[in-house]
Amino acid sequence: MSPIWSNWPGEQVCAPSAIVRPTSEAELADVIAQAAKRGERVRAVGSGHSFTDIACTDGVMIDMTGLQRVLDVDQPTGLVTVEGGAKLRALGPQLAQRRLGLENQGDVDPQSITGATATATHGTGVRFQNLSARIVSLRLVTAGGEVLSLSEGDDYLAARVSLGALGVISQVTLQTVPLFTLHRHDQRRSLAQTLERLDEFVDGNDHFEFFVFPYADKALTRTMHRSDEQPKPTPGWQRMVGENFENGGLSLICQTGRRFPSVAPRLNRLMTNMMSSSTVQDRAYKVFATQRKVRFTEMEYAIPRENGREALQRVIDLVRRRSLPIMFPIEVRFSAPDDSFLSTAYGRDTCYIAVHQYAGMEFESYFRAVEEIMDDYAGRPHWGKRHYQTAATLRERYPQWDRFAAVRDRLDPDRVFLNDYTRRVLGP
């Protein structure tokens, strides 16, 4: 009987022929080579934190949780080598012990390092690139069990954001930075003021993002500044109370909205009124990531920064015009361009607009309508979140698409690492 695997929200389910948990690079290479000889396909999985079926397979699934060690730390240069299954949540404190930290992070941290980088996971901050751009070298196990060390050239630029389509990354060497403190201030503002002053907020802060419930006229802005000051940690009990209140309040409101969709506008305004100002000063890895306990599904698009304000307003107008029962806020973030071939921020200053829906509520009509808006801006969907694009629609949005395809054809000509998702978004 085949094992059953599901992703973290339980929305993607598959039955691999086997789930294998290697604990060394040599074992990983052998598992891949043997599967390829049998004619089986292979996919690697870390935390299963993607909303798409990117990890699913009916072939051999490689569980990367046996490869989580920190292998080398060069404190003077900040170069840190970790195994491909290392979890961001564990890496933060491990680096902090050595007075180092990741330059930037997303707003959740259960992902594995290679799962996060393979999908171009990002944080916010217009002067900072996504996480994959911090990879200075990597080791890639190909379909034949060969281990490639990559630090330059097309293979390297393709492998940093690869969707797992080139092989399995056994190790990455990251460029880290000296340990720093992050000062975060959350403040409720009018949506009109937030949009009017958007460039000021984005350019005037190290990191800036904001959240808006589509039926409300307020936004929650989050500004963050870096420093070498000592942290002033929030007491554990106070942090726990705040997280439980925030997650519990959102959960209760979402459950009410799922049962009575027509009251979504009033619930949006209620949730907005519950948002309050707060300040945190702590080590960056404790501040970047927040606890998300309410189940949801998500789609996120990367568009040129200059189109962000207009695109957001169109999404809000869409929700209001169609009276859609949306219970989660829209999240807006920003990042610097980078040069990974399939990075969603390739070659342009980027605004990310993420839309969500509470688990168990209809989302497809909302997501498809938002996607149509993002198409007008050559939007690039987050590789690990829901979308409806195909290779045919995506190709023109990535200037280096053909260079990635050439690397894929050379490294995996027999498509050992193919699954339904990569077939759809990259082609057969």
Swiss-Prot record:
The protein's GO terms of the molecular function aspect are: D-arabinono-1,4-lactone oxidase activity; FAD binding; L-gulono-1,4-lactone dehydrogenase activity
- Which positions, given as ranges, span the membrane? none
Q: What is the designated name of this protein?
A: L-gulono-1,4-lactone dehydrogenase
State the family it belongs to.
Belongs to the oxygen-dependent FAD-linked oxidoreductase family.
- Which cellular components does GO assign to this protein? peptidoglycan-based cell wall; plasma membrane
Top EC class of this enzyme: oxidoreductase
What does the record's cofactor remark say about binding?
Divalent metal cation.
Highest taxon of the lineage: Bacteria
Database matches in NCBIfam families: bact_FAD_ox
Sorted UniProt keywords: Ascorbate biosynthesis, Oxidoreductase
Its needed co-factors are: a divalent metal cation
Q: What does this protein do?
A: Oxidizes L-gulono-1,4-lactone to L-xylo-hexulonolactone which spontaneously isomerizes to L-ascorbate. Can use both cytochrome c and phenazine methosulfate as exogenous electron acceptors, but molecular oxygen does not serve as a substrate. Is very specific for the L-gulono-1,4-lactone substrate, since it cannot oxidize L-galactono-1,4-lactone, D-glucurono-3,6-lactone, D-glucuronate, D-arabinose, or D-xylose.
User: From what organism does this protein derive?
Assistant: Mycobacterium tuberculosis (strain ATCC 25618 / H37Rv)
Please state the Enzyme Commission number of this protein: 1.1.2.-
The record's listing under PROSITE patterns reads: FAD_PCMH (PS51387), OX2_COVAL_FAD (PS00862)
Among the GO biological process terms of this entry, one is: L-ascorbic acid biosynthetic process
Q: Name one Pfam family in it.
A: FAD_binding_4
